[in-house]
Amino acid sequence: MKIMIVGASRGLGRALVEGVCRAGDTVIGVSRRRPDAVMLPPGVELQWIEADMASPAEAATRIAQAAPSAFDVLICNVGIWEATAFTDGYAFLDEPDDAIVDLVTVNITATLLLLKRLVPRLLESCKPQVILTGSTSALRQSGRPEVAFGASKFALNGVADALREGFRGSRLAVTCLQLGNLNTDDALSVPIEEAAARGDGGLVPVHDVVAVVRTLLRLSDAAFVRELVMPAIADERF
C-alpha cells in the first residue's frame, strides 16, 4: 500500500507517518520541511516531499510533480487556526483580515487544489481512499466560537460529500475524521496509558487516532466509514 500524508512533520501527522503502515508499505510524507529521525516499522519505505501549503498553487504543483503516478491513500492533515483560538482571549472581531485569509488559504484552498491534482492518481488504485482531518468544531452546535477555523473545517464536510458523489462510480472512499482536542505532545513512543493521563480525560492521544486510521485502511473495498467523531471522554460538549 502507498499512503501519502500531508501535514506530516509533527503532531498527529507525524504519528500517522510513524504508525499506520506495516511491512511492505510506502509512506510519503508532505510538509514544509522534512523532520529528523522519523521512526518507522521495519520494512516500511519512507519518501518525503517538501511543500508549503501557505502557497497552495505552488505547493500542489510541487507535490504533483514529486508524487507517484499511482497510490492508494491520501490523508489530508491540513489545518491552522487563529493565534488565540481555544483560549479565553479569542475574539472574532479582533482577528486581522490577513490572518483570516491565510487560514482559509491553507485549510480550504490548498486542500482543494491538492485533491484536484492527486485524485486521478488515487483512482489508479483498486481501493482508492481519501481521509480528511476535520474537527469537532465542524459539527453543528459544537459550542466553539472560533469562526474562521470552524468554517474551514465545516467546509471539509462539503468537500467530502461532493467527492463521494463525483467519484462514486470509481468507488472512491472518503472519510472525515471529526477530532476533538488532541494530545500532540506525547508521541507514539510514549506509552498510551501515560499519554491518556495527560489532560485528565480532556485530550485524545494521537495513539487512538492512529489506531482508528489503521482500521480504516484495512477495511474491504465493499465498505467505508463516512464520518467518525472522536471527542475526548471528558468533553462536556458531547
Region annotations inferred by a language model:
Residues 9, 17:
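N-terminal Rossmann NAD(P)H-binding glycine-rich loop of SDR-like oxidoreductase domains
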Residues 70-72, 122-135, 169-173:
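Active-site loop of short-chain dehydrogenase/reductase
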Residues 85-101:
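Substrate-binding pocket helix/loop in short-chain dehydrogenase/reductase
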Residues 115-116, 161:
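A short, exposed helix-loop element centered on a Lys and neighboring polar residues
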Residues 42-57:
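Rossmann-fold cofactor-recognition segment
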Residues 176-177, 193-238:
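C-terminal helical subdomain
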Residues 97, 129-155, 160-161, 165-168:
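Catalytic loop of short-chain dehydrogenase/reductase
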